[in-house]
């Protein structure tokens, strides 16, 4: 019952799994197929035959038979498809093209489907089977129908045959079944392998094997398995015997030997049984235990494959892992490599999500709550990660050490190349899995290459090598020398090695038997497409092969050097390197030697081709090819890491590491390095230091990368459009550093870039050229060089070199590298071109539409650059080389219209050298034909013109003192501790100085004689027109050209012209008013040159005046010149444009040492400068103006009056006398006015003091205590003056006034002076609220909050726009400062010594109440003298002019004070009598700016004076006295005084002044002495004016 239920369930399940198909749902037996069965059956047979794999055929047959059985089960009699048709169709499927495998597949699927289709009709099935005889073989094997097809006799026979074949053993195939037989077989095999003559006994051993097999009925398959297993253990030494044994055995496929050297026959031939045995054994090895046995067995398999015993695919298809698994692993590995290639590319900050403020608290709580859970999750994640990583390692180990990958590796090692190449072509990404595959394939290629490499490269390198040393030993007591014996050992490692006296060679020497070496370079090119195309960039893992190919390429190009086929050969190698060699350099692991070998080949390529290869690698290959992408990313990250660690401390260690990385993979590592240089200043110097370890390949790529970055599309100027971008400057400095410190660095292409981009006026090219000249050439411009150094620079060679070192001009030290830099220009014939380009750019810079300041700066820069470049060329090129590389004088002048100063500057040194070396040389020969079109030679002598421009400062000036000074400096050096070599060097230097000094003196004498001879002619023709032409075309252009030329012009005109002509020239130059125009038009450097010229001229003229060479008329003329120059300078400085002021200051900076001389001129100049400073806002004008003013004022003490400079006329003398009298009268009048004002002020103050004393009577003050607070007319002492408003109005107060008011209150709150801050409040209601608040008892926190609320409300009533951000910032400051205040007791309820205490100890009143009526200096912590404190309110009108509207200090006595002397009048605080801090600070700043004559002269001093130590010991109370004598120097400094006053005030506040009541008499005595001790009479003397008294107080000053 249970069985029927189970069967019914299975039946129902099968129906669900395979539902009956209707013709409409059928995929093969559709209704159309059934209707046209005769034609469609043939099509179905063809479709079946077209299927290739067995899996596809099985699927197709399964579907077909399911549909057939479904159709047959319907029993449709009207159907055109009969059972016989189905049988015929099945026979056709089986017998189609007579393939046996078809019958097996069709039969098996027929049986399988018939067993699975539910509700099948057995009779119909049996009938169908009887009609298909071709399936009977399969039916008898597997189907239950076989019993229905046989009769009784056939069934009996079948049982007998089955019993005999299935259940009776004929051969033993298990070792345990016949251990004796298999044991003897193994023993025989071991004996055979140990037999040294086994190779000659192969037949005998094979016969014995057959004998054992027959004797013990051993199974042949198991016997073959045993032979293979045993032989694998002896494969190292016995592989030859093993192959010979198999060849003679029956197992050898003699009729169909496998051919594994042909792509088409890799799956044909061989012993299939042996292949299955080998595959099975390879799959059964335990990798952890049988690794060594597995490798030996694998090597045996490779030998069998190579000899054709088995075919490749019979092993490949059956060895683990399956291709699906391997491909999945490769895909995962590729994904990991992709992730690694993008590692560090994404910015983690850019991808990080910002956290909102609202969620921060929740997230923190969640972190706290879930801390334990997170820890557990983290531990579990780490555990899972470890397990996963171990699983990955296990999988990788299985794939690499066992199975298919291992098979490919060992096949390559044994020289079986074709199968491996076939697989790698089909699955090229297998190389990702194993690095060894590429190495082993490269080993094969290197074997093929070695004969060609030996024949083409130098083969005699090892002929001169010495033989190995002999070994000395004692044999049988005899000393003998024997050669070293090398022991050879066979190993399974493919690469031979030598260790000490042991040589390890590969055991299978026939591995290369099927390999044919290359015979020519063409063979190399042809076979590289086979081998290297598969290896790809992994060729970089075989650096020796890479080097050999590169050397062959070098030898091939050198062999064809000079032939017509050279270009063809180079083109072939360019393509070869581009495809095979260069991509492999990226995978070299820190091997700069290999890249150097590659570059030795690439050096023969044109740089355009090299740069194309570099660019292709950077932009395409490194992005498309995954191994290159990974390598590039790795190198880039490593370069960035080293750059971060690179510093001065680590440069010695990290530089070599960094250089090794860059020399190996420069394209990947130099780009981040150069970008780092662009962004940071200090990196450049470190990288330049590192570059000295680069190889040539890195230098070439570095030049390419620099050009790439220089031509990158980005702005070269900053946002202001004026200054160059920082990256341009940094790259320029870096390039210059490379050219200076790296002699192997080739910058020829950068020079080409400079040359080509200069045509477009590129600022980058200008910047690079400038840095090259400064850094490499060591050239320094002559701007800001003093006159002494200029003269030394134009002296003999020793002085010139010394002066150059003083100004940091290192051209002499950099001669070698500067000559190398010059060679880059000469190689491209670019010297004259660059000179003309820079000259043209200079002209264009003057015509641009920019601010004059910018144009001037650019013009100076371009002039300096051109001058420096010419100096570099003249220093490096001498004689013939200079003449060959620089355009002739005439061509520069006539064709290219180079200006006269530049043309002569270029050729002047060459002309001097030619004249000195060749006496017959004539300058006319050189300049003959030169057309000076801008010079009217009819009005000026050509001889004068050419002589003026040809000569240099060296020729016309000789100063012996310069040579003597240098000689004395060298002679004075302490030579006692010097070495002999250094002493000798100093002696030689002194000798050179003497020799060059004599030579210079001779040249100067020769020039002087020449000029003296020519001057006779020049002085004859010296009219006004000639002078103007001379000034216009000679003096002015050369003065503006350079500092040395400016001095030359001065020396020349003094040397070449007589005094009268000299005066005429100078008179025309000065009185023509060209100085002002010149200074406006010229640049800053040219203004300095003009200053040098006038400095020397005026210095010489002044020297002539002092020496008496000038008469009165000449002195008067000189004064007129000084006046004209002063007038022009003042006019220039009075201009509002920038150029006039700046150039005027620059001119005066040089001239001010000798000019002006007259005191009035100096005063005029510095007065003009001071007037300019009033409204000047430009810092580059203010700073030099201030310095110039100081210098001019310092010269006033040595300045001359006019009568000291020259004789005055009678009219001038009378005017001087009248002026002095008028000045004296003005001075007397001012003194009288001041005295009168002081007297009026003093009387006014005395009257005020008297009225205050009367009002401060104690009874009256108590009665009117509260009323005094609200009185609006108290203390009013001026009539008809407006009353101060009781309440500020926002409409009346300006914003600046409000902010100052807020700052004042904040100042006192910050220093905890709350009462002072309250006293500044201008609102009576708010003042009352604050006073009331200070009386209440409350916590300090509430007190501060309430105070803040009142102040903030008060401030907001003063301003129209409370939302103003500056005002809000002031309120924030108020909130911070309010935290500093503490509770201060109110005066009437607390200590008698408080801020506003009314009755205190007062001093006895003097006659004039001069010392009474106010708080004592010690008694008021608010006391301060006239203050310079700018934090006080600045918009409150003077108290002396208005009645007091603020709340006054309380006048009622303190409750705690018992002393009440009614005879003493209370000293009220007044505007001029001992004011407190709060009252004094409320005065206007303008009051303190008044003259001393306008202020009240009777004031208390700023600080109290404490008595000496004796009085302090006698009485603890220190009565402070006010010193009436001269104030100390410290009192003149408000800041120090203020600080000291605060210290004394704090000290007094800490004392207990209640103790002073016990010493009243003494106290009053001290007071009387203090106030009246210095009086000489009962009447106080009125203060004296500036002329009165011996002492002038600080207030009168």
From Swiss-Prot:
Component of the THO complex, which is composed of HPR1, MFT1, THO2 and THP2. Together with SUB2, TEX1 and YRA1, THO forms the transcription/export (TREX) complex. THO associates with DNA and RNA in vitro. Residues 1419-1430, 1568-1582 have a biased composition (Polar residues). One of its GO terms (cellular component) is THO complex part of transcription export complex. One of its GO terms (biological process) is cellular response to azide. PANTHER family: THO COMPLEX SUBUNIT 2, THO2 PROTEIN. Residues 1250-1274, 1384-1597 are annotated as: Disordered. Present with 521 molecules/cell in log phase SD medium. It comes from the Eukaryota. Residues 1458-1490, 1500-1512, 1522-1545, 1554-1567 have a biased composition (Basic and acidic residues). GO terms for molecular function: mRNA binding; nucleic acid binding. InterPro entries: Tho2, THO_THOC2_C, THO_THOC2_N, THOC2_N. It comes from Saccharomyces cerevisiae (strain ATCC 204508 / S288c) (Baker's yeast). Component the THO subcomplex of the TREX complex, which operates in coupling transcription elongation to mRNA export. The THO complex is recruited to transcribed genes and moves along the gene with the elongating polymerase during transcription. THO is important for stabilizing nascent RNA in the RNA polymerase II elongation complex by preventing formation of DNA:RNA hybrids behind the elongating polymerase. It is found in: Nucleus. Belongs to the THOC2 family. This is THO complex subunit 2. Keywords: Nucleus, Transcription, Transcription regulation.
């Amino acid at each position: 019952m249970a069985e029927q239920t189970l069967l019914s369930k299975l039946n129902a399940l099968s129906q669900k799994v395979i539902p009956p198909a209707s013709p409409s749902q059928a995929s093969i037996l559709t209704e159309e197929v059934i209707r046209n069965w005769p034609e469609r059956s043939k099509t179905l047979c063809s479709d079946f035959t077209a299927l290739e794999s067995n899996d596809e055929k099985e699927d197709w047959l399964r579907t077909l038979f399911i549909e057939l059985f479904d159709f047959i089960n319907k029993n449709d009699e009207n159907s055109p498809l009969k059972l016989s048709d189905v049988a015929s169709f099945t026979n056709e499927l089986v017998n189609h093209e007579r393939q046996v495998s078809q019958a097996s597949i069709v039969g098996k699927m027929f049986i399988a489907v018939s067993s699975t289709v539910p509700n099948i009709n057995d009779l119909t099935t049996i009938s169908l089977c009887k009609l298909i005889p071709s399936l009977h073989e399969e039916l008898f094997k597997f189907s239950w129908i076989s019993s229905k097809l046989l009769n009784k006799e056939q069934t009996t026979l079948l049982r007998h045959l089955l019993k005999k074949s299935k259940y009776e053993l004929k051969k033993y195939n298990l070792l345990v079944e016949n251990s004796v037989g298999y044991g003897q077989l193994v023993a025989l095999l071991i004996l055979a392998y140990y037999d040294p003559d086994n190779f000659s006994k192969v037949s005998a051993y094979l016969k014995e094997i057959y004998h054992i097999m027959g004797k013990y009925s051993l199974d042949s398959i198991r016997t073959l398995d045993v032979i293979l297993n045993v032989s694998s253990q002896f494969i190292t030494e016995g592989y030859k015997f093993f192959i010979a044994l198999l060849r003679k055995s029956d197992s050898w496929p003699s009729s169909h030997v496998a051919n594994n050297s042909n792509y088409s026959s890799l799956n044909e031939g061989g012993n299939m049984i042996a292949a299955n045995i080998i595959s099975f054994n390879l799959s059964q090895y335990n990798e952890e235990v049988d690794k060594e046995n597995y490798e030996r067995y694998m090597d045996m398999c490779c030998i069998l494959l190579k000899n054709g015993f088995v075919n490749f695919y019979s092993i490949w298809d059956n060895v683990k892992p399956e291709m699906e698994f391997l491909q999945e692993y490769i895909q995962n590995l590729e994904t990991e490599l992709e992730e690694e290639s993008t590692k560090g590319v994404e910015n983690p900050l850019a991808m990080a999500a910002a956290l909102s403020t609202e969620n921060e608290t929740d997230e923190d709580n969640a972190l706290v709550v879930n801390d334990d859970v997170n820890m557990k999750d983290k531990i579990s994640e780490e555990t899972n990660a470890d397990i996963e990583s171990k699983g990955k390692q296990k999988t990788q180990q299985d794939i690499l050490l066992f199975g298919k990958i291992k098979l490919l590796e060992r096949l390559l090692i044994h020289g079986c190349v074709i199968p491996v190449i076939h697989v790698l072509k089909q699955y090229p990404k297998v190389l990702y899995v194993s690095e060894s595959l590429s190495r082993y394939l490269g080993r094969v290629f290197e074997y093929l290459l070695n004969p060609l490499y030996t024949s083409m490269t130098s083969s005699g390198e090892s002929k001169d090598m010495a033989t190995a040393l002999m070994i000395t030993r004692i044999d049988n007591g005899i000393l003998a020398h024997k050669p070293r014996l090398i022991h050879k050992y066979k190993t399974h490692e493919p690469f031979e090695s030598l260790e000490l006296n042991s040589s390890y060679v590969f055991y299978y020497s026939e591995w290369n038997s099927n390999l044919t070496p290359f015979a020519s370079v063409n063979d190399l090119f042809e076979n590289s497409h086979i081998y290297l195309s598969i290896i790809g960039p992994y060729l970089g893992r075989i650096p020796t092969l890479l080097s050999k190919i590169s050397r062959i390429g070098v030898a091939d190009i050198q062999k064809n050097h000079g032939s017509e086929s050279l270009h063809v050969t180079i083109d072939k190698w360019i393509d070869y390197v581009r495809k095979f060699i260069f991509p492999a350099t990226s995978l070299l692991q820190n091997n700069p030697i290999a890249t150097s070998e590659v570059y030795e080949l690439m050096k023969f390529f044109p740089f355009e081709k090299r740069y194309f290869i570099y660019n292709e690698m950077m932009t395409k290959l490194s992005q498309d090819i995954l191994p290159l992408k990974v390598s590039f990313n790795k190198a880039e990250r490593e370069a960035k890491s080293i750059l971060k660690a690179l510093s001065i401390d680590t440069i010695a260690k990290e530089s070599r590491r960094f250089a090794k990385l860059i020399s190996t993979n420069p394209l990947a590592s130099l780009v981040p390095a150069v970008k780092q240089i662009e962004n940071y200043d200090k990196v450049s110097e470190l990288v330049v230091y590192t570059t000295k370890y680069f190889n040539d390949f890195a230098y070439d790529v570095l030049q390419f990368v620099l050009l790439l970055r220089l031509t990158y599309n980005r702005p070269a100027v900053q946002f202001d459009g004026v200054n160059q971008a920082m990256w341009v400057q940094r790259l320029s400095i870096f390039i210059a550093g490379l050219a200076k410190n790296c002699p192997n660095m080739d910058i020829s292409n950068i020079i080409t870039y400079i040359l080509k981009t200069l045509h477009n006026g590129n600022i980058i090219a200008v910047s690079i050229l400038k840095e090259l000249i400064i850094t490499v050439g060591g050239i320094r411009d002559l701007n800001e060089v003093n006159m002494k150094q200029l003269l030394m620079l134009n002296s003999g060679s020793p002085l010139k070199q010394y002066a150059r070192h003083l100004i940091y001009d290192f051209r002499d030290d950099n001669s070698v590298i500067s000559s190398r830099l010059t060679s880059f220009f000469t190689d491209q014939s670019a010297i004259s071109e660059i000179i003309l380009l820079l000259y043209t750019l200079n002209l264009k810079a003057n015509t641009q539409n920019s601010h004059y300041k910018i144009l001037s700066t650019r013009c100076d820069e371009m002039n300096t650059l051109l001058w420096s470049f010419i100096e570099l060329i003249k220093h490096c090129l001498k004689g013939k080389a200079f003449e060959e590389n620089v355009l002739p004088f005439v061509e520069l002048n006539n064709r290219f219209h180079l200006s006269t100063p530049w043309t002569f500057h270029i050729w002047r040194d060459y002309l001097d050298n030619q004249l000195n070396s060749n006496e017959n040389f004539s300058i006319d020969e050189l300049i003959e034909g030169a057309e000076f079109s801008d010079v009217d030679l009819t009005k000026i002598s050509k001889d004068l013109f050419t002589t003026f421009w040809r000569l240099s400062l060296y020729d016309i000036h000789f100063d012996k003192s310069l040579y003597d000074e240098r000689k004395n400096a060298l002679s004075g050096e302490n030579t006692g501790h010097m070495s002999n070599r250094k002493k000798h060097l100093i002696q030689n230097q002194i000798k050179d100085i003497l020799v060059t000094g004599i030579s210079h003196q001779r040249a100067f004498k020769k020039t002087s004689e020449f000029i003296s001879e020519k001057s006779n002619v020049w002085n004859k023709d010296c009219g006004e027109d000639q002078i103007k032409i001379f000034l216009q075309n000679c003096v002015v252009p050369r003065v503006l050209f350079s500092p040395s030329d400016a001095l030359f012009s001065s020396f020349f005109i003094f040397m070449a012209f007589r005094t009268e002509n000299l005066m005429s020239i100078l008179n025309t130059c000065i009185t023509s008013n060209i100085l002002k125009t010149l200074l406006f038009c010229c640049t800053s450097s040219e203004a300095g040159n003009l200053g040098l010229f006038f400095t020397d001229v005026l210095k010489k003229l002044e020297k002539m005046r002092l020496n008496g060479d000038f008469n009165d008329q000449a002195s008067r003329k000189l004064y007129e010149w000084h006046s004209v120059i002063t007038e022009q300078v003042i006019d220039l400085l009075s201009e509002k444009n920038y150029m006039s002021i700046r150039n005027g200051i620059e001119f005066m900076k040089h001239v001010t040492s000798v000019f002006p001389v007259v005191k009035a001129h100096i005063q005029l100049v510095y007065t003009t400068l001071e007037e300019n400073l009033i409204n000047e806002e430009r810092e580059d004008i203010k700073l030099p103006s201030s310095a110039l003013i100081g210098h001019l004022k310092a010269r006033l003490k040595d300045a001359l009056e006019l009568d000291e400079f020259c004789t005055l006329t009678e009219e001038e003398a009378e005017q001087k006398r009248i002026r002095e009298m008028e000045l004296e009268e003005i001075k007397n009048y001012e003194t009288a006015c001041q005295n009168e004002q002081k007297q009026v002020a003093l009387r006014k103050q005395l009257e005020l003091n008297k009225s205050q004393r009367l009002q401060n009577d104690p009874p009256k003050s108590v009665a009117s205590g509260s009323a005094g607070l609200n009185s609006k007319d108290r203390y009013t002492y001026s009539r008809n003056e407006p009353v101060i408003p009781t309440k500020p109005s926002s409409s009346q107060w300006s914003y600046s006034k409000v902010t100052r008011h807020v700052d004042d209150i904040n100042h006192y709150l910050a220093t905890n002076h709350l009462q002072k801050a309250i006293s500044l409040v201008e609102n009576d209601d708010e003042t009352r609220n604050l006073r009331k608040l200070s009386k209440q008892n409350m916590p300090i926190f509430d007190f501060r909050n309430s105070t803040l609320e009142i102040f903030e409300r008060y401030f907001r009533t003063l301003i129209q726009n409370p939302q103003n951000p500056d005002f809000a910032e002031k309120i924030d400051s108020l909130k911070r400062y309010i935290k500093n205040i503490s509770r201060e007791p109110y005066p009437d309820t607390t200590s008698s010594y408080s801020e506003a205490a009314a009755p205190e100890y007062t001093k006895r009143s003097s006659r004039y109440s001069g010392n009474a009526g106010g708080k004592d200096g010690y008694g008021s912590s608010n006391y301060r003298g006239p203050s310079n404190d700018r934090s006080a309110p600045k918009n409150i009108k003077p108290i002396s002019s208005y009645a007091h509207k603020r709340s006054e200090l309380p006048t009622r006595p303190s409750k705690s004070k018992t002393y009440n002397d009614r005879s003493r009048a209370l000293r009220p605080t007044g505007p001029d009598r001992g004011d407190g801090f709060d009252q004094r600070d409320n005065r206007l700043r303008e009051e303190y700016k008044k003259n001393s004559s306008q202020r009240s002269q009777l004031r208390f001093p700023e600080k109290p004076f404490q008595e000496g130590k004796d009085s302090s010991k006698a009485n603890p109370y220190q009565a402070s006295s006010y010193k009436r004598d001269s104030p100390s120097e410290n009192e003149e400094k408000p800041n120090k005084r203020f600080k000291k006053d605060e210290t004394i005030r704090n000290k007094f506040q800490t004392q207990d002044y209640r103790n002073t009541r016990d010493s009243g008499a003494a106290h009053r005595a001290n007071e009387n002495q203090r106030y009246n001790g210095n009086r000489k009479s009962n009447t106080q003397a009125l203060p004296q004016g500036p002329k009165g008294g011996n002492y002038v107080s600080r207030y009168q000053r």
